[in-house]
């Protein structure tokens, strides 16, 4: 029998939503929804479960799903961020996916979780430092938050300290 390799398996919206339905936890949904003001599309899947599934998806053919997803559920948005952060790829390609994803971030949980999962920001400091700069002056709340969380999560280092403070001040002035 000829089995497909993981990379040959096409991720689909149907596949993702079926997983979400199978792992829905209404008790957790009620709890988690209270932490997300203004977000009313929570199914209630715990983050460790989403992370495990995202790691599986990141080894498959996920790019078309990422591009075409309509993010009906909060967890779909979270998965798109996690998959793009976990997938093996060069820094330049990842930053392309990050740039596509950041405008879709619409709450603190997706923003903060996504930023903390972008582990290659520690390896490619210069590339990420340059990349996040424009987000500090964004008029969009979660784009500016993305920049601040990335800075605090990956750039609190002596060599970036002065410029980090300047960028955070710029961001505060811009959103005031």
Enumerate the language-model features and the residues they cover.
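Alpha-helical scaffold domains
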Residues: 1-172, 176
């Amino acid at each position: 029998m000829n089995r497909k390799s993981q990379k040959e398996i096409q991720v689909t919206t149907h596949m993702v939503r079926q997983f979400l339905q199978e792992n829905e936890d209404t008790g957790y949904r009620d709890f988690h929804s209270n932490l997300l003001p203004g977000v009313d599309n929570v199914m209630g899947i715990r983050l460790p479960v989403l992370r495990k599934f995202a790691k599986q998806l990141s080894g498959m053919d996920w790019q078309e799903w990422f591009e075409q997803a309509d993010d009906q559920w909060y967890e779909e948005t979270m998965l798109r961020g996690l998959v793009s952060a976990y997938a093996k790829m060069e820094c330049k390609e990842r930053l392309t996916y990050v740039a596509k994803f950041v405008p879709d971030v619409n709450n603190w949980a997706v923003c903060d979780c996504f930023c903390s999962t972008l582990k290659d920001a520690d390896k490619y400091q210069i590339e990420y430092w340059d990349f996040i700069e424009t987000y500090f002056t964004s008029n969009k709340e979660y784009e500016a938050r993305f920049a601040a969380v990335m800075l605090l999560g990956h750039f609190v280092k002596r060599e970036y300290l002065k410029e980090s403070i300047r960028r955070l001040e710029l961001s505060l002035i811009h959103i005031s």
